[in-house]
Amino acid sequence: MRKPVIAGNWKMNMTCTEAIEYMRVLIPLLKDIPKKDREIVIAPPFTALYPLSEFIRDRNEYLSLSSQNVHWEDSGAYTAEVSPLMLNELSVKCAIVGHSEPRKYFSESDEQINKRAKSAQDHQLIPIVCVGETFQQREMGEAERVIRRQIEQGLEGIEVKRLIVAYEPIWAIGTGKTCEANEANRICGLIRKWIGYEDVIIQYGGSVKSNNIDEIMSMSDIDGVLVGGASLDPTNFARIANYEKI
């Protein structure tokens, strides 16, 4: 039985003060979620990980933290990077790797993403490995080939039992355009087939909102969501976390 993971990626948003105030609103709104039914994850900016880890320590039983990236070395001359050892000290559970934004803005390769994912697993972190195609690649009929390459190269040598994959069609991220639920489900099913492990957790990401979450989570091969902009409002994110299957 695959346990859905609802994750909010704040990206480069919220100061430490704002993050704490957010949690003061969010945590009470999650109290009725069946804890055995789903897991809730927040990926704040690196600066907010420490205050949030301290704040939620004794305040909830169902909320975990994720980093927005992780380096493959434990330490060294890697300006602006964060090591897995640093994250371990903060009781961080997951690490997002391969998101389309660092792929686009910092030219991250599948090889680098693979190294990040391996480093995460080597330090007891669960990597959330993001894959997805551009609009042009989809229009040219290249979506499946591109995603399969990302899976094969990005997950080489990865322990699939300690892994989350997030399918995020790049053309749907932050655009208001959502991949139709049936099509997202089809791609997630293909990803599961390519990985070759039935119980791998596969999320969908791309303009997930409170008004489409119930349909998305009703799909048979979608095991959660990776939410961007819609996770910045605690009331809105709570509605997403409290989804009900149709």
From Swiss-Prot:
Top-rank EC class of the record's enzyme: isomerase
One Gene Ontology term, aspect cellular component: cytosol
Function recorded in the entry: Involved in the gluconeogenesis. Catalyzes stereospecifically the conversion of dihydroxyacetone phosphate (DHAP) to D-glyceraldehyde-3-phosphate (G3P).
Catalyses which reaction(s): D-glyceraldehyde 3-phosphate = dihydroxyacetone phosphate
Organism (species): Prochlorococcus marinus (strain NATL2A)
Residues annotated for substrate binding in this entry: N9, W10, K11, G174, S207, G228, G229
Molecular function as annotated in GO: triose-phosphate isomerase activity
Keywords associated with the record: Cytoplasm, Gluconeogenesis, Glycolysis, Isomerase
Major location (coarse): cytoplasm
Annotated localization: Cytoplasm
Protein name: Triosephosphate isomerase
GO biological process: gluconeogenesis; glyceraldehyde-3-phosphate biosynthetic process; glycerol catabolic process; glycolytic process
Pathway: Carbohydrate biosynthesis; gluconeogenesis; Carbohydrate degradation; glycolysis; D-glyceraldehyde 3-phosphate from glycerone phosphate: step 1/1
Top-level taxon in the UniProt lineage: Bacteria
Keyword Isomerase part of the UniProt annotation: yes
Residues annotated as the enzyme's active site: H99, E168
Description of how the protein assembles with itself and partners: Homodimer.
Homology family: Belongs to the triosephosphate isomerase family.
E.C. number: 5.3.1.1
Pfam families linked to this entry: TIM (PF00121)
